[in-house]
């Protein structure tokens, strides 16, 4: 019976300071040789997936926390908020003092006139690492799949959540400076369910690796969830853990699950 193995990207499969570890690449190659379906399951949209991750020989991708799903080159989902409502959303972000970049499956967009200190390093990193995909708001096509914000005033996050609630769910990362705003009705979990149905995988043969709170829907959906050794503490209290990305966590976890030797 075919198996489905899903990997979060940031902090699980990839970090800027260590890229994708060689041990993880070899482990994934072994999984594919064993006939398993291997997929990315990331909060990132396609425009900001690192090239080294894109080059992995995976079956497909769940991106943007479930707003984009592709299997063997076939796009199953490419969801976005469109039209005039996008301008209302932008007004709320400005009013709540939340510098942002808007994501969809094609590009990401930010306001070059609104880059306070809390947002400056992110903008520099994005422009350096993904120059072909960074666009200014003058080019924004009123199509939002996901928003990442760097709030100037975190005391207003409850207000932000309430005002965006008709269209979005908000994931607050206490350990990071940014928060993620996800199109309502979508998550990594909804993407996983869609892939399970499309590939006709037995749910008991599903596995997921993650490290942060946006991975929770994926970890709850698969039969076998495992978190990295340096994962968010609340996840480590709920799911078994492997070692960190710096200590061959993917390879060790796959061995612990009996998927590779």
Give residue ranges: language-model regions.
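Residue-level signal for inorganic ion chemistry
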Residues: 31, 42, 147, 192, ...
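Active-site phosphate-binding/coordination module
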Residues: 17-117
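Conserved acidic, metal-coordinating active-site core of Asp-based
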Residues: 92, 96-209, 213-218, 230
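Short active-site oxyanion
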Residues: 35-39, 58, 145-147, 204-205, ...
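Asp-based phosphoryl-transfer active-site loop
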Residues: 3-17, 219
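Short, well-ordered beta-strand core segments
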Residues: 5, 61, 99, 225, ...
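Phosphate- and divalent-cation-binding pockets in alpha/beta enzyme and binding domains
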Residues: 23, 47-51, 159, 191, ...
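Asp-based, Mg2+/Mn2+-dependent phosphohydrolase catalytic module
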Residues: 221, 225, 229-261
């Amino acid at each position: 019976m075919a198996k489905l193995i899903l990997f979060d990207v940031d902090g699980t499969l990839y970090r800027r300071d260590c890229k994708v570890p060689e041990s993880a690449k070899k482990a994934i190659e072994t999984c594919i040789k064993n006939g398993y379906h291997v997929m990315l399951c990331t909060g990132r949209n396609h425009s900001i997936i690192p090239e080294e991750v894109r080059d992995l020989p995976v079956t497909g991708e769940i991106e943007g926390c479930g707003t984009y799903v592709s299997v063997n080159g076939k796009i199953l989902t490419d969801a976005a908020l469109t039209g005039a409502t996008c301008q209302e959303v932008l007004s709320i972000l400005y009013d709540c003092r939340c510098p942002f970049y808007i994501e969809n499956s094609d590009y990401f967009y930010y306001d070059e006139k609104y880059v306070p200190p809390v947002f400056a390093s992110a903008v520099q990193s994005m422009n350096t690492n993904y120059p072909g995909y960074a666009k200014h708001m003058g080019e924004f096509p009123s199509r939002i799949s996901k928003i990442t914000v760097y709030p100037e005033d975190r005391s207003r996050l409850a207000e932000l959540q309430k005002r965006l609630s008709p269209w979005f769910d908000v994931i607050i990362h206490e350990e990071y400076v940014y928060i993620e705003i996800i199109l309502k009705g979508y998550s990594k979990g909804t993407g996983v369910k869609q892939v399970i149905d499309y590939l006709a995988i037995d749910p008991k043969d599903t596995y997921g690796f993650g490290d942060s709170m946006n991975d929770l829907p994926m970890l709850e959906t698969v039969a076998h969830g495992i978190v990295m050794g340096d994962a968010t503490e609340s996840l480590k209290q709920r799911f078994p853990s492997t070692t960190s990305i710096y200590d061959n966590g993917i390879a060790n976890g796959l061995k612990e699950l009996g998927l590779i030797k």
